[in-house]
Amino acid sequence: MGNDCAFTTIGDPMTYSTCGYLLRALRRVLPELECEIVAGVNSWSALAAASASPLVEDNGVLRIVPSYLRPDSPELHRMLETEGAVVLLKTYRSRNEYLDSLAGEEYDLLYGANIGLENEFISSDPEAIRERPDEYLSMLMIRKGARR
Protein backbone atom coordinates (compact mmCIF):
# COMPACT_ATOMS: atom_id res chain seq x y z
CA MET A 1 0.00 0.00 0.00
CA GLY A 2 1.05 3.56 -0.57
CA ASN A 3 2.63 2.77 -3.92
CA ASP A 4 1.97 4.68 -7.10
CA CYS A 5 1.37 3.02 -10.43
CA ALA A 6 0.52 4.04 -13.97
CA PHE A 7 -1.61 2.54 -16.71
CA THR A 8 -1.03 3.58 -20.28
CA THR A 9 -3.28 2.88 -23.20
CA ILE A 10 -3.37 3.42 -26.92
CA GLY A 11 -6.55 5.16 -27.93
CA ASP A 12 -9.13 7.07 -25.98
CA PRO A 13 -8.72 6.25 -22.25
CA MET A 14 -12.36 6.74 -21.30
CA THR A 15 -14.16 5.81 -24.54
CA TYR A 16 -14.69 2.10 -25.25
CA SER A 17 -11.39 1.39 -23.51
CA THR A 18 -9.92 -1.23 -21.21
CA CYS A 19 -9.01 1.66 -18.93
CA GLY A 20 -12.65 2.14 -17.90
CA TYR A 21 -13.17 -1.54 -17.12
CA LEU A 22 -9.91 -1.70 -15.16
CA LEU A 23 -10.74 1.44 -13.18
CA ARG A 24 -14.16 0.06 -12.21
CA ALA A 25 -12.60 -3.25 -11.08
CA LEU A 26 -9.93 -1.45 -9.05
CA ARG A 27 -12.52 0.76 -7.34
CA ARG A 28 -14.46 -2.34 -6.27
CA VAL A 29 -11.45 -3.69 -4.36
CA LEU A 30 -9.95 -0.30 -3.45
CA PRO A 31 -12.84 2.14 -2.90
CA GLU A 32 -10.41 4.76 -1.58
CA LEU A 33 -8.37 4.62 -4.79
CA GLU A 34 -7.13 8.00 -5.92
CA CYS A 35 -6.52 8.26 -9.61
CA GLU A 36 -5.77 10.87 -12.21
CA ILE A 37 -6.62 10.30 -15.84
CA VAL A 38 -4.81 12.44 -18.34
CA ALA A 39 -6.73 12.60 -21.58
CA GLY A 40 -4.99 13.10 -24.84
CA VAL A 41 -6.57 14.14 -28.11
CA ASN A 42 -9.32 11.68 -28.94
CA SER A 43 -8.97 9.70 -32.14
CA TRP A 44 -11.88 11.25 -34.04
CA SER A 45 -10.63 14.78 -33.38
CA ALA A 46 -7.14 13.71 -34.46
CA LEU A 47 -8.55 12.28 -37.71
CA ALA A 48 -10.50 15.47 -38.42
CA ALA A 49 -7.43 17.62 -37.77
CA ALA A 50 -5.03 15.42 -39.75
CA SER A 51 -7.37 15.51 -42.75
CA ALA A 52 -8.44 19.16 -42.34
CA SER A 53 -12.06 17.93 -42.32
CA PRO A 54 -14.51 19.56 -39.91
CA LEU A 55 -16.39 16.96 -37.91
CA VAL A 56 -19.56 19.02 -37.48
CA GLU A 57 -20.61 22.59 -38.10
CA ASP A 58 -23.60 24.77 -37.32
CA ASN A 59 -26.43 22.54 -36.06
CA GLY A 60 -24.76 19.26 -36.97
CA VAL A 61 -24.76 16.41 -34.46
CA LEU A 62 -21.67 14.31 -33.75
CA ARG A 63 -22.27 10.65 -32.95
CA ILE A 64 -19.45 8.38 -31.78
CA VAL A 65 -20.52 4.78 -32.28
CA PRO A 66 -18.77 1.44 -31.78
CA SER A 67 -18.81 -0.60 -34.95
CA TYR A 68 -21.02 -3.32 -33.45
CA LEU A 69 -23.82 -1.39 -35.16
CA ARG A 70 -24.35 -3.32 -38.39
CA PRO A 71 -24.02 -1.48 -41.73
CA ASP A 72 -27.61 -2.35 -42.71
CA SER A 73 -28.99 -1.29 -39.33
CA PRO A 74 -32.03 1.02 -39.48
CA GLU A 75 -30.57 2.82 -36.45
CA LEU A 76 -27.39 3.69 -38.36
CA HIS A 77 -29.36 4.90 -41.37
CA ARG A 78 -31.54 7.10 -39.12
CA MET A 79 -28.37 8.64 -37.69
CA LEU A 80 -27.04 9.27 -41.17
CA GLU A 81 -30.19 11.09 -42.26
CA THR A 82 -29.56 13.98 -39.90
CA GLU A 83 -26.98 16.67 -40.48
CA GLY A 84 -23.66 15.98 -38.85
CA ALA A 85 -21.24 13.09 -38.61
CA VAL A 86 -21.22 9.50 -37.46
CA VAL A 87 -17.82 8.16 -36.45
CA LEU A 88 -17.64 4.38 -36.26
CA LEU A 89 -14.78 3.21 -34.06
CA LYS A 90 -12.79 -0.01 -34.38
CA THR A 91 -14.04 -0.84 -37.86
CA TYR A 92 -11.38 -3.47 -38.51
CA ARG A 93 -13.89 -6.34 -38.69
CA SER A 94 -16.61 -4.69 -40.76
CA ARG A 95 -14.99 -1.86 -42.72
CA ASN A 96 -15.69 -3.35 -46.15
CA GLU A 97 -19.29 -4.14 -45.21
CA TYR A 98 -19.80 -0.46 -44.35
CA LEU A 99 -18.23 0.57 -47.66
CA ASP A 100 -20.54 -1.84 -49.54
CA SER A 101 -23.62 -0.69 -47.66
CA LEU A 102 -22.93 3.00 -48.24
CA ALA A 103 -21.74 2.74 -51.86
CA GLY A 104 -23.73 4.98 -54.16
CA GLU A 105 -25.16 6.99 -51.27
CA GLU A 106 -24.48 10.70 -50.96
CA TYR A 107 -22.18 10.49 -47.97
CA ASP A 108 -18.69 11.79 -47.45
CA LEU A 109 -16.60 8.88 -46.15
CA LEU A 110 -13.23 9.23 -44.47
CA TYR A 111 -11.27 6.28 -43.12
CA GLY A 112 -8.46 6.64 -40.63
CA ALA A 113 -6.18 4.05 -39.08
CA ASN A 114 -3.35 4.38 -36.58
CA ILE A 115 -3.89 8.15 -36.38
CA GLY A 116 -0.88 9.92 -34.92
CA LEU A 117 1.35 6.88 -35.29
CA GLU A 118 4.15 6.23 -37.76
CA ASN A 119 1.92 4.04 -39.94
CA GLU A 120 -1.01 6.50 -40.01
CA PHE A 121 -3.36 6.05 -42.96
CA ILE A 122 -6.14 8.42 -44.01
CA SER A 123 -8.20 8.09 -47.17
CA SER A 124 -11.60 8.77 -48.68
CA ASP A 125 -10.93 6.43 -51.62
CA PRO A 126 -13.00 3.26 -51.10
CA GLU A 127 -10.61 1.12 -53.17
CA ALA A 128 -7.54 2.29 -51.23
CA ILE A 129 -9.42 1.65 -47.99
CA ARG A 130 -10.39 -1.88 -49.08
CA GLU A 131 -6.74 -2.71 -49.78
CA ARG A 132 -5.74 -2.02 -46.18
CA PRO A 133 -5.20 -4.88 -43.74
CA ASP A 134 -7.51 -5.17 -40.75
CA GLU A 135 -6.40 -2.48 -38.30
CA TYR A 136 -7.69 -2.39 -34.73
CA LEU A 137 -7.09 1.36 -34.32
CA SER A 138 -9.38 2.33 -37.17
CA MET A 139 -12.45 4.45 -37.71
CA LEU A 140 -14.80 5.52 -40.44
CA MET A 141 -16.23 9.04 -40.45
CA ILE A 142 -19.48 9.34 -42.40
CA ARG A 143 -21.08 12.70 -43.10
CA LYS A 144 -24.11 13.66 -45.11
CA GLY A 145 -23.72 16.78 -47.21
CA ALA A 146 -20.25 17.46 -45.83
CA ARG A 147 -18.18 20.44 -46.87
CA ARG A 148 -14.46 19.86 -47.06
Stretches with model-predicted labels:
Residues 9, 66, 144:
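Pocket-edge structural micro-motifs
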Residues 14-82, 131, 148:
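Class I SAM-dependent methyltransferase SAM-binding "motif I" and its flanking Rossmann-like core
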Residues 1-3:
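Ligand-binding beta-strand-loop-alpha-helix segment within the catalytic cores
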Residues 5, 78-148:
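A contiguous loop/helix-start segment that scaffolds small-molecule binding in enzyme catalytic cores
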Residues 7-9, 37-40, 57, 88, ...:
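General beta-strand structural signal in soluble alpha/beta enzymes
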Residues 13-15, 118-119:
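Short, small-residue-enriched loops and turns at beta-alpha junctions
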